[in-house]
């Protein structure tokens, strides 16, 4: 076990209970944040992205020898959303550079997932631009995690999004909700319809592909 004083990773994710914000009202309260490991600047070393529920997310650059540097602001990781959950590294636009997708499951105004597209590496530091809205991936559901894969075998990466309603279990009853789609809690499948390497465009094909999207998405 290496201390933060050696590694430079001083990140701590604290879940602070409040009178109206706790495990009794939100069953996913202790699900925690997320971690992604991958090479964001193509130097052969594994870098680290960690998400927080209450504080800022962090991107750490691996300097070698188990030493890391916080490059969050320098890399353009801005626009904090409340209650970040899962984070995924993937080369979304196929340009050979690692992009970042962050899931957010907070209050209405601070929800909306984020897509950081790698604009290139300068001085060993990756430069990112947030492009979720224009790419069609700024989903406003209660997202837990996302996975990128080529589901239609056309050579580019599509995305499956795992959502999960915060509705307490005792409120669900015994009704079969599988065929009832839920905007916030239902899982979704997004097809990559990007026409070229510069423009990024995803289409929600959940219903067409037969993805059940009930409020029990986990």
Question: Where are the predicted features?
Answer:
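Beta-propeller-forming repeat regions
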Residues: 1-218
């Amino acid at each position: 076990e290496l201390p933060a004083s050696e590694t430079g990773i001083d990140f701590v994710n604290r879940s602070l209970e409040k009178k109206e914000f706790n495990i009794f009202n939100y069953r996913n309260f202790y699900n925690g944040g997320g971690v992604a490991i991958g090479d964001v600047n193509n130097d052969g070393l594994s870098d680290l992205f960690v998400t927080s529920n209450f504080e800022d997310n962090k991107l750490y650059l691996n300097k070698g020898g188990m030493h890391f540097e916080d490059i969050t602001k320098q890399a353009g990781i801005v626009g904090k959303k409340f209650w970040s959950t899962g984070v995924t590294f993937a080369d979304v636009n196929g340009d050979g550079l690692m992009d970042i997708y962050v899931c957010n499951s907070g209050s209405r105004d601070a929800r909306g997932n984020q897509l950081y597209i790698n604009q290139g590496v300068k001085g060993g530091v990756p430069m990112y631009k947030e492009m979720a809205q224009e790419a069609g991936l700024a989903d406003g559901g209660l997202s837990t995690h996302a996975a990128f894969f080529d589901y239609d075998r056309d050579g580019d990466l599509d995305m499956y999004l795992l959502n999960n309603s915060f509705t307490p279990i005792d409120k669900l009853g015994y009704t079969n909700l599988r065929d009832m789609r839920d905007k916030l809690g239902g899982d979704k499948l997004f097809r990559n319809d990007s026409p070229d390497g510069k423009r990024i465009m995803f289409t929600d094909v959940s219903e067409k592909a037969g993805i059940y999207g009930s409020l029990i998405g986990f």
